[in-house]
Amino acid sequence: MSSYPNTKIYNTLPKILRHRAETIPNTVALRDKDLGIWNEITWKHYNDQVSYLALSLVKRGFKTGDVIGLIGDNKPSWLFFELAAQAVGGMSLGIYRDTLDEEVGYLIDAAKVNFVYAEDQEQVDKILTINRPKGNKINIYYEDSRGLKELEDPNITDMLDLISEGKEIASKHPDKYNKMIDKVSADQEAILCTTSGTTSNPKLAMLPGGKFIEHVLRYLKVDPKNINDEYVSVLPFPWIMEQTYGVGFNIVGGMKVNFPERPDTAMDDLREVGPTFMLGAPRLWEQIAADMRSRILDAPKITQWLFNVMVERGLKAVDQGKRDFLADKLLFSSLKDRLGFSKVTSAATGGSAIGPETFKFFLAMGIPLRQLYGQTELMGAYTLQDVPEGTMDCETVGVPFPDCEIKIIDPDPNGLGEIITKHPSMFSGYYNNPKAYKETIKKGWMHTGDAGYFDDQGRLNVLDRVNDIAIKSDGVKFSPQNIENKLKFSPYVGEAVVIGAEKPYLTAIICIRFSIVSKLAEKWQLAFTSYTGLAADKKIYALIEEEISKVNEQLPDNIKIAKFLLLFKELEADDGELTRTKKVRRSVINSRYKDIIKDLYLDKDTASIDTEFTLEDGRKSKISATMEIRHLIDTKTSKTTKAKSKANKSSKGKK
């Protein structure tokens, strides 16, 4: 802890930033890749940019308590504006860059935003669609000037002009910025962070700057970071965990943050950096694992055989809390090097549950991946796995951080109940929504809505949302998410929705991982022109059937998947089926695809849908499709169907 700034003195992020600029001015704080070149940003330059923007924003009317909206890719400019707002005593509201126009408008209006950093023309255009009363214009600041330079709008300004303006103010009033940030207290709300929004529109959690710092320090006690650590920022800044690492661990811990040139170059750029720490949501880890397994499809058969044998050896060793020397020598060490993970000493996954097979795969590779658990309202994670050498834990999210308390309320006979929690650095409320705060915080405890239990070692196991824990018609409880995560370990399964609440058996709606399945289809010389056509192909059905059968072998007889179908489209956040953090909105799926779900529980071989629904942006969409229902288990006898073995044979050896 002694290497971290004294937060009793430096109790806001801008104050800590200034302290670093004064004590280690020429040390690299950030790197940003542009046109193939990594540009280094020192602590002094970082602090200068923030101070110039803050002074300019004040001149333009930004004041204590105001909110600045931020939308774009992860870039240093985002951080400059975020810290500038906090320097004034204002708040930042991060918006996911793929958010639709109408969603952007909802968030901007909900937070009463009058100032916005929009990275480029695409994001500026979204802000311009927001209708505001005459004379109440939104001030927009951009970084990428392409397509914007010729605009003659006094409310749209290049951020370079703000920096120049602020620099001039600083030259005339050298103490103005320091006096400004010294007035801002630790209790001042600094960040507006959106909740996940799985059941409704996201709420805006208000995070005081001082409490955010307190919790970052709490985290650093269990997972220390310093100026020698390297991190690549690939997850969106609006997510609380990227705020923790990309902002908190950077400024408070000193960890260097590297920004890829573009989202689609992130993995290549990561290899160049060689990070010491990696954070990924489960979907990222699933995609990396799937990509590695798919690449082997193009390799000679002997290489494919070696890959599969070594992976199996590695996974068996992990189950015993060990590493397999031969598998590491022949496979995993080269995989780590190819991914850019050779220097990783700490890695984490959070945001939702990760499938145990995916988790074990990275442990077998030698990546010290650990699960964490938390909520936006509690400043992010407050548990982290601590796995002693020679043991293995792929089920729990570990134990609470110091000063964090967790209880299970209303437990069933097996100890499963709702998780409630509290710690000293919680959020101060939901912006302009006191009713929601009272519903969430009761007697100081946050009711998470998650279902979990403690194991005999006091480790927390999170199963699913309380409302999503399902009970079959025979009274058997199961977690759809747990089964879905097992399915998504397959490189061919992009998304899965398991159904079975109040039903006699389980079924699944599957979305294929098009990027990988299409590659396999080309190898098999299958004719297709679209996702829909490929998802209807019988050979692809046979492929997915084989993958589901592997998962069924791991499941108890009373919760095996009896039937499945391949959905004619991918689930999309823009269609309201996923959140912006890619979590399934089950209520939307159950409503939109109710006809399909009904057919899955009838004695039918096809499911049909013919309906119209409203998209997130208000547009109407008409759906008309018929899909094959594949039977894995005879629902009358509970025996595996003969069709399965035939299908599996037909899928093997196809070229």
Predicted regions and their residues:
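Conserved ATP-binding loop and adjacent catalytic segment of the adenylate-forming AMP-binding
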Residues: N258, D337, K343-T349, I354-G417, ...
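Conserved pre-ATP/AMP-binding loop-to-beta segment of ANL
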Residues: P25-V28, T157, S164-T194, N201, ...
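Conserved AMP-binding/adenylate-forming core of the ANL superfamily
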Residues: L30-L83, L100-G105, D158-I163, L207-G210
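Conserved AMP-binding A3 loop
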Residues: E40-K44, D182, A190-E214
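Conserved ATP-binding/catalytic segment of the ANL
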Residues: K407, N414-K472
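Conserved AMP-binding/adenylation subdomain of ANL enzymes
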Residues: I213-E230, F237-F332, K343, P368
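Conserved ATP-dependent adenylate/AMP-binding module captured primarily in the ANL superfamily
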Residues: T99-T129, I213-V232, P263-F277, R338
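Conserved structural elements of the adenylate-forming
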Residues: N47, S51-Y52, A186, A205-N226, ...
